[in-house]
A protein has these predicted regions:
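Acidic catalytic motifs of isoprenoid enzymes
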Residues: 1-180
């Protein structure tokens, strides 16, 4: 496995941000360098999970027994939330994307606990540093991932409260992360 320094990890996140959204990238340039790097890391994670859910990213997953069990457990929770609704994808594709989100969730926990290694994905290396420097809540990242899980199902918000809940997950939670 490739080893990444913290500087390389932040450079990777900056590249993701610059390539994905020149508007966001330009607006972030007004921030102080340390805050800008942290925002690039958060943006890179959000872009990555969105690309996975949309099928624009093929995640490399080391499928372990722990990951399979965690995915099964998370799928039961998501099935309860979306009771009566089938995923938008084939069962195999849905499982693959759900497993990728669970893997990311587990890695976020490791980053918040400062247990990421230099061989982990550069986004997690950068986020580990962000968790150390800023009072960011892991729960807000989990809320963003819950919004991505919702995107694996047909979005059919029928009430204002349903729309508000969805928007909170995919937008407001990101804002809560960034204001820290």
């Amino acid at each position: 496995m490739r080893q990444h320094t913290l500087e390389q990890a932040y450079a990777y996140c900056e590249t993701v941000c610059r390539n994905a959204s020149t508007t966001f990238y330009s607006s972030f340039s007004a921030l102080q360098p340390d805050k800008r790097r942290a925002v690039h890391a958060v943006y890179a994670l959000c872009r990555w999970v969105d690309d996975i859910v949309d099928g624009d990213e093929e995640p490399t997953i080391l499928e372990t027994l722990e990951l399979r069990q965690a995915t099964d457990e998370r799928q039961r929770i998501v099935d309860d939330i979306h009771a009566g609704t089938s995923p938008s994808l084939t069962p195999d594709e849905h499982r693959r994307r759900m497993m990728a989100l669970v893997d990311i969730r587990l890695k976020l926990h490791q980053a918040s606990e400062q247990s990421i290694s230099q061989s982990d994905h550069p986004i997690f290396i950068a986020l580990q540093d962000v968790f150390q420097r800023y009072p960011i809540k892991l729960n807000d990242f989990e809320t963003v991932i819950e919004g991505m899980e919702d995107d694996l199902y047909p979005v059919a918000n029928q009430t204002w409260d349903e729309l508000r809940s969805y928007c909170y997950k995919v937008a407001s939670a990101v804002g809560l992360i960034l204001i820290e």
